Amino acid sequence: MKLTSMIPPQVNLANGCFTAPDVQRKSTTLGSLAGIFADPVAWQSLPAELAVYQVEMLPSVQQEGELFVGTTHLQPGRVGDEFFMTRGHFHQRPEQAEFYFGLRGQGLLLLQHQDGACTLEQVSPGSVHHIPSFTAHRLINTGNDVLSALAVWPTVAGHNYDALQPQGFKLRVFADGDDWKAEAQYE
């Protein structure tokens, strides 16, 4: 029997960056987040090409039992008084759960169950977050540095952005002096 040795992909746990030949990367700009922020005038006043967050992930086979691993890097910033955030989503297969691991920065994970119940969890280096099935999720950067979170989720989960329309998430997070405050947008 011939034994082979390989160097697997690496992740820097201080910043969430992957080292591998086939890392997939995607950047989401402010211009692609139309309708996400509460203040459309403030949103339009900022450069459309401004990168709000980047996702890098390792490729994986998309079939039952397989997992993706990736990192979201959410930039610090605001649109008006509202902190930068990811688009957020339910899973296309809503019974699929996910884990987030805080790596750097300070922020929040907004969880909204399909029944409308919301929870905000503080994200920081070392924090561990279970995103239950049937739960939409969004990262919010309340700090002054990049917020990075490593995620592990089933390759069959998919993303369902339309399930939150037309109202979006129930909660929004705004700056409140040096802190933050959450405001309900609807009942």
Residue ranges and their predicted role:
Residues 1-14:
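N-terminal capping/interface segment
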Residues 121-125, 129:
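Charged, surface-exposed interaction regions in soluble eukaryotic proteins
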Residues 17-122, 142-147, 152-187:
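Active-site region of the double-stranded beta-helix
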Residues 7, 36, 128-131, 140:
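Weak global preference for isoleucine
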Residues 108, 128-129, 133-138, 158:
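Histidine-centered metal-chelating micro-motifs
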